[in-house]
Amino acid sequence: MYAVIKTGGKQYKVAAGEKIKVEQIAADVGQEIVIDQVLAVGEGSSIKVGTPLVSGATVTVTVLSHGRHDKVRIFKMRRRKHYQKRQGHRQNFTELQIGAIVG
């Protein structure tokens, strides 16, 4: 069984037992969270697609860790104008373990 969930403005296709990294969620490590923004639920060849959400469908996840992604380096330059700008960014993430999918 799989589900398409929405968290942090992004959509993820998940199945029970998987680990995913999502945008940072304000939760403690080891805490269980119920995600109710389920866009679709499928099992085998049957699929339920919500309009926009599947009513009554939930996904239970466990917070494994918090961290930061690798640095993304931004470099801007205007040719012949002696303008160069460097910038770096590290995005925070939360690693989740997918538990039960109800739907």
UniProtKB/Swiss-Prot annotation:
Keyword RNA-binding: yes
Gene Ontology BP annotations: translation
Taxonomy, superkingdom: Bacteria
Alphabetized GO MF terms: rRNA binding; structural constituent of ribosome
GO cellular component: cytoplasm; ribonucleoprotein complex; ribosome
PROSITE patterns given in the database record: RIBOSOMAL_L21 (PS01169)
Record-linked InterPro entries: bL21-like, bL21-like_sf, Ribosomal_bL21, Ribosomal_bL21_CS
Record key words, sorted: Ribonucleoprotein, Ribosomal protein, RNA-binding, rRNA-binding
Keyword Methyltransferase: no
Protein's job: This protein binds to 23S rRNA in the presence of protein L20.
Subunit structure: Part of the 50S ribosomal subunit. Contacts protein L20.
Family affiliation: Belongs to the bacterial ribosomal protein bL21 family.
NCBIfam families for the chain: L21 (TIGR00061)
Name of this chain's protein: Large ribosomal subunit protein bL21
Species the sequence originates in: Polaromonas naphthalenivorans (strain CJ2)
Encoding gene (name): rplU
